[in-house]
Each structure stands twice: as C-alpha cells, then as structure tokens.
Amino acid sequence: MARFPKINLDITHRCTLQCRRCNRAIFAARGQKVPGEDMTIENFKKILDFFEEITFCGQISDPIFHPKFIDFLKLCKDKKVTIHTAASHKKEDWYKKAFEANTNAYWTFGIDGLPKDSHKYRINQDGEHLFKMACMASKIVKKVKWQYIVFNYNENNIEEARQMAKDNNLVFEVQKSSRFWEDDPLMPKNKEYYIERKNYENPTKV
C-alpha cells in the first residue's frame, strides 16, 4: 500500500515552448543550461510504491517529451494520474496512443486564449493543433481540462472560449497569474484577472 497521498513529478528537462514567464526563460536570459534529466523507468517504479496520486506537471519541462512517457502512463493505470501539458510538437497518432495508454487519466491543456492566439504567450505553440488534441482526449480519457491563463490579448475572449470548451466536453478553468511586473506588456487591463505582487521585477533581466 502507498504511504503518501500524492506527488508532482518533473520527469524531464525538455520543452519546445518559450513561454516568457516560465523558469526556462530565466535560465535562457542568464545563458544557463536548463537543469535536469530524464527520469528512468526504474526510479519511476520506485515512486509508484509510495504514492497514490501522480501528477506530471513540469516546472521547467513538458512531460510529453520524456521518451518513455507513454510507458509511464501504462505503469500507473491503478493510480490517479493527472497530466499538465502545453506543448504541441507531437503528431496526432502519438496523442492517441498516449490517451489510450491510460484512459483513467486526467489531462489539462494549457491554451491561453482562443486556440489561434495562444502562441502570443506560449511561443512556438500550435494552439489550434493542441485544441484538436484536447477534443480528441475528451472522447477517450476520464476528464479533460482547458486551462486558460488571462493576459491582455485574451481577456476579452473568455466567454467565447468557455463556450468552445462546453461544446467539446472540456472543463474550462480561468487562471489568474501573479507573474506580472509594473508596466508588463502582457498584464490584463482588468485588475480582476491577475494577482498583484508588490515590488515584483522582471526576473529575466540580467
């Protein structure tokens, strides 16, 4: 029997996105290599012995880029599993295999704005492709969530996105960010859509 309720894992160091508020941007600004490595299957199996719930939510990576990620999903079918992803650089057949590998999993897709606009923050993301994959997931896995962080370019599209989510059986979640500094060009105009942090400075300035 597992000894602890849950754990979040950052299982790789890879991501194809260049989100401007991600910790990866800080490493890049400082000319540093993103730390980390791919978790081994052996170490992952050890973790499964201790935890009931497994969350794959990378702080400096996207879990879909672990070369054995589908194998990881197969190994934890008897656990509660949640995947957070925002990268889109996988083909449709890969996503289908991933969804089918663990149909009890919960998937959260980070699409910040209407799918055609999400790349304005999530640089290199194909939001329209990712939205299609989220819609596919909703027909295969247990639960699919559309996570929508509010920025100035998408704050007026929330209700349209909410309806899109409803039409495609996606749970819609609006998130307020606290990673804005004074005169930040991405900060929403409506103060209800962000969390203010006093004296917060641009961490990518070196």
Predicted regions and their residues:
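Conserved alpha-helical substructure of the radical SAM core
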Residues: M1-Y106, K120-E128, K132, N168, ...
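Glycine-centered loop/turn positions within well-structured domains
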Residues: L17, K116, V144
